[in-house]
Structures are given as C-alpha cells and as structure tokens.
C-alpha cells in the first residue's frame, strides 16, 4: 500500500458481503472461497481496502449508518434491527461502548437477517454480514478500545442524543418512504 501502510481488512464485494482480515487475504475471490470466511458472497466486486490507521469503530458505525439510512421501514426486523445496530455502533464509536454491546450486535444479526427471505427485500440479509464479520473478526481490537475509554466520556455520551438514521448526513436526504398511489375522483 502507499506510504508503507498495512492492510487491516478488505471488503471484497461491496459493504453487504462482510470483511476479510489481513490474514484472510490469501483466499480466492470466488463464491465458495469467500463463504469459508463467513462472507455473504462477492456482491458487486467493488472492493474497499481498509488500512492500519483506520479505527475499526469508524468502519462499524459507517456500515451501520448506511443500512439504517437505506431501510425503507416497511419490515419490522429491518426498520428496528438496523436502527438498533446503528445506536449500538454509534455508542461504541463515540467512546461509550460496553463489551456487552459487541454481543448485542452479533445477536441482532441473528435475529434480523440470518434466515434469508423473511423480508420484502434483501436489505436486512445484506446488513447483517458486515456487522457480524466486523465485530467477530476485530473483537479483540474492540475490547481493547472499550477498555481504554474514560469513564467521563461514557457519561458524556450517555447524556448526548443519538441521532436517528434520518438525521445523519448521508446525501443530505431522507430515505424515500413507500406510499399508496393517489387515485383520481374518476377512479382512473
């Protein structure tokens, strides 16, 4: 990598497929090989390379924010699950996470999308793989960062309001909500 940076991880196929650690980069880029590393598949093959100076908490909260923002809100497990994942990831990223939050995130992934086909679209299925793999594969790093938190910062974060997915600065727009088409007075 440029500047003598080291690879921390690679998301090989768009954010929904999950993450490979630096130690897993010798896997083949085919569907069967990446599945052995807990990934959903190859997705769009739009690779994202994360270097060693990137805080894993930032990766986690950005992924959670993306999926919470993209949820249309029609399916309960997606609307509630992505919202909860964002709240927990945001708490961790802002320096007030708990070890139990890591377990909560993994539990949420099992409750909202590990059985494909239970929602209108595939968004909850795609949301769980990156969260699950980031937490599981970088757990030691998360635990170390949580252990280094200042108790005062934890109190400050608890007092702050966590923004909803709609208030977050992604494209500066709210997600489109499904609405019933209007009908004319003539019934046409």
Protein language model features and the residues they cover:
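Redox cofactor-anchoring modules in respiratory/redox and cofactor-processing assemblies
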Residues: 1-188
């Amino acid at each position: 990598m440029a500047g003598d940076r080291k690879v921390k991880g690679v998301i090989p196929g768009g954010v929904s497929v999950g993450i490979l650690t630096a130690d897993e980069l010798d896997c083949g880029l085919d569907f069967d090989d990446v599945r052995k590393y807990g990934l959903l598949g190859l997705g769009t093959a739009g690779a994202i390379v994360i270097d060693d100076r990137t805080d894993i908490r930032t990766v986690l909260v950005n992924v959670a924010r993306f999926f919470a923002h993209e949820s249309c809100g029609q399916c309960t497990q997606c609307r509630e699950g992505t919202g909860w994942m964002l709240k927990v990831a945001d708490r961790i990223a802002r320096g007030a996470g708990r070890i139990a939050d890591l377990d909560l995130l993994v539990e949420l992934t099992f409750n909202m999308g590990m059985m494909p086909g239970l929602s209108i679209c595939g968004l909850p299925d795609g949301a769980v793989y990156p969260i699950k793999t980031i937490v599981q594969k970088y757990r030691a790093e998360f635990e170390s960062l949580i252990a280094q938190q200042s108790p005062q910062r934890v109190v400050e974060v608890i007092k702050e309001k966590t923004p909803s997915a709609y208030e977050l600065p992604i494209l500066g727009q709210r997600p489109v909500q499904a609405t019933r088409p209007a009908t004319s007075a003539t019934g046409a």
